[in-house]
Every structure is written in C-alpha cells, then in structure tokens.
Amino acid sequence: MALSKNSNSNSFNKKKVSYISVPSQIINSLSSSSLQSLLVSPKKSSRSTNRFSFSYRNPRIWFFTLFLVSLFGMLKLGFNVDPISLPFSRYPCSTTQQPLSFDGEQNAASHLGLAQEPILSTGSSNSNAIIQLNGGKNETLLTEGDFWKQPDGLGFKPCLGFTSQYRKDSNSILKNRWKYLLVVVSGGMNQQRNQIVDAVVIARILGASLVVPVLQVNVIWGDESEFADIFDLEHFKDVLADDVHIVSSLPSTHVMTRPVEEKRTPLHASPQWIRAHYLKRINRERVLLLRGLDSRLSKDLPSDLQKLRCKVAFQALRFSPRILELGNKLASRMRNQGQYLSLHLRMEKDVWVRTGCLPGLTPEYDEIVNSERERHPELLTGRSNMTYHERKLAGLCPLTALEVTRLLKALEAPKDARIYWAGGEPLGGKEVLEPLTKEFPQFYNKHDLALPGELEPFANKASVMAAIDYIVCEKSDVFIPSHGGNMGHALQGQRAYAGHKKYITPNKRQMLPYFMNSSLPESDFNRIVKDLHRESLGQPELRMSKAGKDVTKHPVPECMCSDRQQQEQQSDA
C-alpha cells in the first residue's frame, strides 16, 4: 500500500517539477494501462470485505495501519522539496553526446579527441536531480566563487613615465641614422619574444638604429616564420618611435658593410659592460650583429630602461592581425558560457628531454626519453649532474596530468569548470591526460575549438600555434602553468600588467612530499595544498624584493604604480 501511494505522489509531482529521479525513457516506455496498474489496487472480493470487517476490530491492525500512514507521511515530506533549491544537472541523460556549439557556427573537429562535454549545454525536463548531501549544502556553489575570485591588485596600474633626461636623450638617439644593430633571436616563440625585448634595450643603450630582429629557424620545431608573420610590425615601429629608430632592413649605404659578429655576451651584462665592449666597435664598423642574447642582459637596469622593457613587452609586441583574430575567436568560444581556466601543460617529448625529467608513464617511455637525451646531450638545460629524482624533489620537473588534477581539486576548482589547455601533444598521446579529462570533462585545446580549416594556414608553424595559445591563456580568468618556462613567465607579467589577473604558481617543491605520501587523507592533502598557495595567486609582488627578478614578470614598481604615485609622476613630467 505504501508503494502505490508513493508512486501516485511522484506521478502527481511530475506535472509540476523537473527533478524526477526516474529517467523519462522508462516512464515513456510504460503504457497508460501499465501506469494505472501501478497506481490503482485491484477490486476486493466480498470475501475480502468480510475479512476487513473482522480485521478493523483488531487493535494490532489499527496500530499497524497508523504506522504505515506515519511512514508514508514522512516519506512524502522528505521528497516533496521545493524544486528551486535543487541544482539541476547541466548534462541531461542522453543516448548521444551533443556536439560543440559556438553560437550557430559549425561544429569544431577535435584534434586529440579530449573534449568530453559540450561547451554549450541546456537542461531539460528529464534531467536527473543532483541530491544535496551534507545537510543540503552544495559544496560546488560554496567553493566555486573562491576559485574564480581575483587577487587584490592593491590599486596598481600601468605607468611608464620616463624621466626628462630619457626624453632629452631620445632626441639625439633618434637622429642618429648611421649605426645599426642586427640581432638574431633563437628558441621558441616566447624565448624569441624575450630576446626581442632585450634587443630594443641594447639598441637604446648603444644609441643605434635597430633592424627588425631575425627569427632563427628552431632545430626542434623547424618553424621558418619571420617577424612580421608573428608580430604586428608596423605597430611595433609606431609604439617605439619615441625610443628607438627601427627599420625593416639595412639601408643601401650599409648593405655592403660586413657586420661585426658577437656571440659571447656574458650572462647578466650591465649597460656599462655593453657600452664598454660594443660602443667603439659599432661606431667604427657601423653595423654590429649580436647572437645568443637569451638572458644575457642584466635584469637589474636603471628605471628608464626597465620601463622600456615593459613598453616593448606589454605594448609594442602585439601579435599580427590574423593571429590576433583567430586567438580572440577561440577565446570568445571559451568565454561563451562565462569563466574559464587555462592550463599550460608541458608534457611534450622535448620537454622531458630538456628538463632531465621522466614522464613516469611506463619503462618504455622512460627509455625513449633517456635514449634521446643520450643522443643529444646538448638539449639538457642546466644542472646536468642532478639525477631525475633530485630534480623532481627540487621542483624542477613539470607536473604530470595526475598531479595537476590533484592540485586543481585541492584548490577547489569546480568539476564543471571549462578548461583550455595549451601546449603540444604530450608524450604518450591523449591517454596521458585521462586523469584530467575524467575529473574535468570540459577540457579543450585549440584544435577542439577551431572550425574546420581555421588552423590549416598555420600547419607546421609552431610559433604561430604558441601565439594562439598565448592569446587564449591571457584572456582566461585563471591561469596555471604545469612548469615554469618562458610562456609562463611572459603571461605572469602580462596578466599582472593587465590588473593582476589570477595566476596560480604551483609550489612544486613544497607540494611533492605530500604527493608522495600515500597515507595522507585526501581532505588533509587538499587543505595543506590550498594553504601552500594562498600567497601564489597572482598578487602584486615587488620586483626589487629580490635581485635578478625580471621586470617583464614582476612589473611592480617600475612599470606599475598606485593612483597617488601616478599623479606624482605626471606632476614631475
């Protein structure tokens, strides 16, 4: 009897709310007669009536009936919940997966097949209700705001007020059109970007005109892109017109001049060292060619030169129009449903080779990495005397997919968070990313988001692909790199300059002991890891707090100031 009444109650509520826990496919498969047989008891015979007339006089039957009525009342009260208080599943039960949708655009083709859920999805009346536990509290709703909450920027804003002496020197420097600096930049796109910044500063130090830097073909990626293929050349010239004279090529008067080539610029070279070693030579030969500038110029420069660094990195180096257009489109597709997180995952084969680390997948993959490293020992970057385990414990290795997943869960990233992942194809293929895709199914890269044919013009252009990743990551609400590197450093400074947008720096060295402690309860692990990152969320950090910090990574205080400081600079101008 209790079962039939409870079914009747659910049938009645079905007309009013959409959180019926019975899937609609089952309900629709039942005929009206079948439903009736569930809800209505068969007629009793007269013999049964006589039995009932006897039974109602029995006190035990009365107590039993009262118990059933009370039980039914409690059940009805427990299930008759206000539907507004129930969070509905965003992904209703369905026999087919909905495709990616971008406001009416064609569906995108997935490159690695990693997108598990549609970006755009709507609920329906046959969605199953998500039952709230822990006293009815929805933990996702309580913690989601904390994850997306932006750090306090303390009122710092971009301010590049150059001194009167700098502006005075500019007049004579810009008139000088007889000596030229040629620079060849190497590495990946973000590494080349850093060297272009330093090339502009060195040209300013020498009082020379700068020929648009030459991008050296990378031995790993083989990208033959030129400066104008990646960056907006005319914008680059216009923004720096008051600082350095920039030309696309050597003038005819200097074409036949054999440039003096220099490859041995030391690490952390100061402006005084640059002038002492290069000024006489460029004045005499009129053309100086520099190579191997990566991290050669000192990070600690006079204030005006630091501001020039910021001006180049954050204002002058804008991507070319076609790259910017596609990058903005992909970012818009991620933004369609609100906030999104971007990850820079460093799990490519060359990354494991260069870092001296192992992917930890299978012995076969470890052997692939070790063999490649033995064949090309020059690819290993620094500290070659350290073992893999020593590097791992020192926090020098990229986080694996499982480690990134545990970090995100500890930081209380919502399970339905939309995640854009940047980077090349990981060693081991898409299976390597399964810990992430299982926990966070809305997981996309540029190939998932792009429409058919959109990326074809950039095939085999690693620098262009890196630029597209950069744009989508820069526009995200939260950014997390699995490893340091040039892109992570560039984005840290870019996001700070844009108002200190949230940037989470994984504290790998301090996290690792807890990753390795299998006996630590998950709740304790999450609490500890979250506490380790309270000061690593992209808050303003003074560059001068430690010598050797890059101003394009930490733009405060040389390139950003408070409202009061900005007013003081304007009054001094």
Curated annotation (Swiss-Prot):
Give the top-rank taxon of the lineage listed in the UniProt record for this protein: Eukaryota
Ranges for the region named Disordered are: 547-573
- The primary gene name is OFUT20
Q: In which tissues is it expressed?
A: Highly expressed in shoot apical meristem (SAM) and in young vegetative tissues.
Q: Binding of substrate: at which residues?
A: H344, L345, R346
Q: What is this protein called?
A: O-fucosyltransferase 20
Localisation per UniProt entry:
Golgi apparatus membrane
**What family does the entry list?**
Belongs to the glycosyltransferase GT106 family.
Q: Where is the composition biased (Polar residues)?
A: 563-573
**Where are the bilayer-spanning segments?**
61-81
Taxonomy-wise, where does this protein's organism fall, top ranks first?
Eukaryota, Viridiplantae, Streptophyta, Embryophyta, Tracheophyta
| Compositionally biased region (Basic and acidic residues) | 547-556
- Which of the residues are on side Lumenal? 82-573
An example of a Gene Ontology cellular component annotation for this protein is: Golgi membrane
Pathway(s) annotated for this protein in UniProt: Glycan metabolism
Q: Name one GO biological process term.
A: cell wall organization
Give the sugar-modified residues. Answer: N138, N385, N517
Phenotype on deletion? Increased number of lateral roots and wider stem diameter. Altered cell wall composition with an increased level of de-esterified pectins.
Q: Sorted alphabetically, which keywords does the UniProt record give?
A: Carbohydrate metabolism, Cell wall biogenesis/degradation, Fucose metabolism, Glycoprotein, Glycosyltransferase, Golgi apparatus, Membrane, Signal-anchor, Transferase, Transmembrane, Transmembrane helix
- The principal localisation class reads Golgi
One Gene Ontology molecular-function label:
glycosyltransferase activity
Q: Which Pfam families match?
A: O-FucT
The residues on the Cytoplasmic side of the membrane are: 1-60
Function (record text)? May play a role in the biosynthesis of matrix polysaccharides and contribute to the biomechanics and development of the plant cell wall.
